Amino acid sequence: GVCTMRDPQIVEKAYEVGVGGNIRGMLGGKVDDLHGEPIEINATVKMLDDREIPVAGADSTSRQNVGRIAVIDHDGITIVVTEAKAATELMNIFKCLNIDITGYKALLLKGFNKAYEEVYEGIVPTGHFLIPDSLGITSPDVRKAGHFTKIRRPVYPLDENVAFRYE
């Protein structure tokens, strides 16, 4: 499989050892304690890059700066690690890094699935998107987006046993 992740410390380690080098460390889980623990990796550095990534579907001048990039392999999983946040649903980072995602069995992206369908149309068959049910804005369960306190309650879909009604 292949995925993207922001982790400046892992990128730094990758740049220290260079392409072909081996890095050990804890990947991810460093922003907060809501999205899981870091995982221990023992990875080989496959590629290093430092450029802005063209935004898919935008004009030719639109770019996103994700900082330095390290492409690593951990147990057969290709991980694109960036220094800054990378909005994978809005950009073609894999194409820009010459990573052919069509050869992978799984492509792990966290974000808005409708945006994925646009960006990856023709690459990933329609209906083959698995929507991650994680905390925050990316969850299909809006109750996980946070605590809603300034709205009339009970309300669908935030409260149980409340039917949807259009007003």
What is the predicted role of each segment?
Residues 53-167:
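Extended hydrophobic packing segments that form well-structured cores
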